[in-house]
C-alpha cells in the first residue's frame, strides 16, 4: 500500500466482527468517509470471530444460567433481558443489511436453532422451574417451554435422554426461536461489503505502534509481514477491535483511560463430532449448570454449529491457560502487558479468584477420559471414537482497578475510549459477538457525540429499536421479533 499525506477518516485495527460491524455502520452513515482495515493474519475472522474459536454463538441469554442468578430466593433476570435486548438490535441491523442487499443469503450466517437449558437432580430442577417462571413473565421470553418429562425432553433433544437411568430427575427449558450464528461468515460478508464500497483491506499488516499527532489525529506504524516493510498512516479516528490484541495497542497509545486495566487470558478446548447420524439427532444449543465455585466460562454446553453449510456438534468448553492474548499470539503477551498502573489490580484479582485458578489447574491436569465423562453426563450414548478434540480461541477477561478491592475480574466486554473520542478499543469477551451492534453503537455515541444527533434518523431506519426497548410495548414485542425472523429466513 502507498502512504497518504492526507489522514484517512477511519482506521479499523483487526479484521473481526467488531471492526466489520463498526465499519459497516459508519459506511451506512457516512458513505464518503475513507476507511482502512489492517489485519495481522492472512484472512479476516481467524481469531475470536472464527466459529470454531467462539465459545457461544447466537448468545441471547435464553439458556445461559449465569445471566439469571438467584439471590435471597429470587431469580434475577435483569442481565438476561439486557443481553436479549442487545441481541435484538443486532438482528435488526442484520435484517436491514439483508433487505438492502448489502448482506445476501442470510442462511449462510444465521440459522434457526432452539436454545435449551438442561439440568439433573431434584434441586437443580426446582431452580430451573423458578427460573422458567420468572423469565416466562417477560415479553422477550414468553415463548419459553419447560418440562421434567423425559419423553418431552427426548422430543426436543434425543441425545440428552437416550440410555439415561429412568429414575434420574431431569428438567429442561426450550426456546424454539433461538439461532446459531456463524460470525466468521458474517464478518466476511461485512468486509466484502466494505471493500466493494471503497474501504481498503490490508491483510498480513500488523499495527506495531501508534501515537497522537498535535492536531488530534493518530499516526500508526504498521509492518507488512509479507515483505517485512513498514508503512505509516495517519487517521482521524482509530478503532482497535483486535480481540486479545486490543489491550497492548491501547497501552501503546498512551491514553489515560487504559490505566488500571489488565488482561487474564484463558484458552479453551472442545470435543467435536461431524458424524451425520449423531448430528441429525441433536438440533439445539443445550447449556447445563456449572459446578459450584466454577467460573461462568465453565458452563458446559452441547452445541449445534452450522459452518459453511455443514453441521457439527461441539461440547465443552474445557478451559486451559496460555499467556497468549491471541490464538496466534506470543507467549510473552501477558507479561508484556504488565504496567506499574495495573500490577496492583492484577495481584488483587489473583488473590480474590483462587477458585478460578484452582479450576484452571484442574482442567489442565484432567485426562481426556475425565473430560469425556463430562460429555457423557449430557449425552449418555457418547462414544470416544466418534469425537475428536479441537483447540478453541483465546479469550482475555478484563481485569480493572476497583476502589474497594484494588482490582476485579470482569466477565463481559468494556469499551475504552479516549476523552476526545479519537480512539477506542474493545476489551473482554462474552457475550461479545452477538451484541456487536449495540457495542459499536456505544462506540459511535462516545466517540462522535457531535454527530450522533444527526445520525439518529438513519440509525432508527436501520435499527428500529435504536434508543428504545423491544419489550417496552409487550403487545408489539412478538411482531418486532417476527419481522426480523422473516427477513433473516428463521423459523419462529
Swiss-Prot record:
Q: Which cofactor does it need?
A: FAD
Recorded metabolic or biological pathway in which this protein acts: Carbohydrate metabolism; tricarboxylic acid cycle; oxaloacetate from (S)-malate (quinone route): step 1/1
In terms of Pfam families, this protein maps to: Mqo
The protein's GO terms of the molecular function aspect are: 2-hydroxyglutarate dehydrogenase activity; L-malate dehydrogenase (quinone) activity
Keyword entries, A-Z: FAD, Flavoprotein, Oxidoreductase, Tricarboxylic acid cycle
Output the superkingdom of the source species: Bacteria
Q: Does Transcription count among this protein's keywords?
A: no
**Enzymatic reactions:** (S)-malate + a quinone = a quinol + oxaloacetate
EC number(s) from the headed UniProt entry: 1.1.5.4
Swiss-Prot/TrEMBL GO biological process terms: tricarboxylic acid cycle
Is-annotated flag, keyword Zinc-finger?
A: no
InterPro entries in UniProt: FAD/NAD-bd_sf (IPR036188), MQO (IPR006231)
Q: Which HAMAP family match?
A: MQO
Q: Which NCBIfam families match?
A: mal_quin_oxido, PRK05257.1-1, PRK05257.1-4, PRK05257.2-1, PRK05257.3-1, PRK05257.3-2, PRK13339.1
Regarding protein family, the annotation reads: Belongs to the MQO family.
Which named protein is this?
Probable malate:quinone oxidoreductase
Which source organism does the UniProt entry give? Clavibacter michiganensis subsp. michiganensis (strain NCPPB 382)
Q: Which gene encodes it?
A: mqo
Amino acid at each position: 500500500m502507498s502512504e497518504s499525506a492526507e489522514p484517512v477518516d477511519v482506521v479499523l485495527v483487526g479484521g473481526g466482527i467488531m471492526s466489520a460491524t463498526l465499519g459497516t455502520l459508519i459506511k451506512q452513515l457516512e458513505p464518503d468517509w475513507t476507511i482502512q482495515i489492517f489485519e495481522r493474519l492472512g484472512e479476516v475472522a481467524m481469531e475470536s470471530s472464527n466459529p470454531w474459536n467462539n465459545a457461544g454463538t447466537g448468545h441471547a441469554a435464553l439458556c445461559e444460567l449465569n445471566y439469571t442468578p438467584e439471590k435471597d430466593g429470587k431469580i434475577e433476570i435483569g442481565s438476561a433481558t439486557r443481553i436479549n435486548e442487545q441481541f435484538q438490535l443486532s438482528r435488526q441491523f442484520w435484517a436491514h443489511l439483508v433487505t438492502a442487499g448489502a448482506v445476501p443469503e442470510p442462511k449462510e450466517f444465521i440459522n434457526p436453532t432452539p436454545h435449551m437449558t438442561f439440568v439433573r437432580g431434584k434441586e437443580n430442577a426446582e431452580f430451573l422451574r423458578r427460573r422458567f417462571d420468572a423469565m416466562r413473565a417477560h415479553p422477550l421470553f414468553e415463548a419459553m417451554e419447560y418440562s421434567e418429562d423425559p419423553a418431552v425432553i427426548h422430543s426436543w433433544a434425543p441425545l440428552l435422554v437416550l440410555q439415561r437411568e429412568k429414575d434420574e430427575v431431569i428438567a429442561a427449558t426450550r426456546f424454539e426461536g433461538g439461532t446459531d450464528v456463524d460470525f466468521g461468515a458474517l464478518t466476511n460478508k461485512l468486509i466484502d461489503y466494505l471493500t466493494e464500497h471503497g474501504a481498503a483491506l490490508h491483510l498480513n499488516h500488523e499495527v506495531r505502534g501508534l501515537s497522537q499527532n498535535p492536531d488530534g489525529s493518530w499516526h500508526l506504524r504498521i509492518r507488512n509481514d509479507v515483505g517485512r516493510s513498514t508503512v505509516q498512516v495517519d487517521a482521524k479516528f482509530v478503532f482497535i477491535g483486535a480481540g486479545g490484541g486490543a489491550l497492548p495497542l491501547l497501552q501503546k497509545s498512551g491514553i489515560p483511560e487504559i490505566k488500571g486495566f489488565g488482561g487474564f487470558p484463558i484458552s479453551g478446548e472442545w470435543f467435536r463430532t461431524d458424524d451425520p447420524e449423531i448430528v441429525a439427532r441433536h438440533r439445539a444449543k443445550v447449556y447445563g449448570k456449572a459446578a459450584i465455585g466454577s467460573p461462568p466460562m465453565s458452563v458446559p454446553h452441547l452445541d449445534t454449529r452450522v459452518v459453511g453449510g455443514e453441521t457439527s456438534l461441539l461440547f465443552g468448553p474445557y478451559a486451559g491457560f496460555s499467556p497468549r492474548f491471541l490464538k496466534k499470539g506470543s507467549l510473552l503477551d501477558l507479561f508484556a502487558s504488565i504496567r506499574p498502573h495495573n500490577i496492583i489490580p492484577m495481584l488483587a484479582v489473583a488473590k480474590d479468584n483462587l477458585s478460578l485458578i484452582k479450576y484452571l489447574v484442574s482442567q489442565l491436569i484432567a485426562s481426556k477420559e475425565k473430560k469425556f465423562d463430562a460429555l457423557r453426563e449430557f449425552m449418555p450414548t457418547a462414544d470416544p471414537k466418534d469425537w475428536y478434540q479441537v483447540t478453541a480461541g483465546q479469550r482475555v477477561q478484563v481485569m480493572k482497578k476497583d476502589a474497594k478491592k484494588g482490582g476485579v475480574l470482569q466477565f463481559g466486554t468494556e469499551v475504552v475510549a479516549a476523552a476526545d473520542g479519537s480512539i477506542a478499543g474493545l476489551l473482554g469477551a462474552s457475550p461479545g459477538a452477538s451484541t456487536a451492534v449495540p457495542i459499536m453503537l456505544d462506540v459511535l455515541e462516545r466517540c462522535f457525540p457531535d454527530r450522533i444527533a444527526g445520525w439518529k434518523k438513519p440509525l432508527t431506519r436501520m435499527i428500529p429499536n435504536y434508543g428504545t426497548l423491544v419489550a417496552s410495548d409487550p403487545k408489539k414485542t412478538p411482531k418486532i421479533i417476527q419481522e426480523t425472523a422473516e427477513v433473516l429466513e428463521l423459523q419462529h
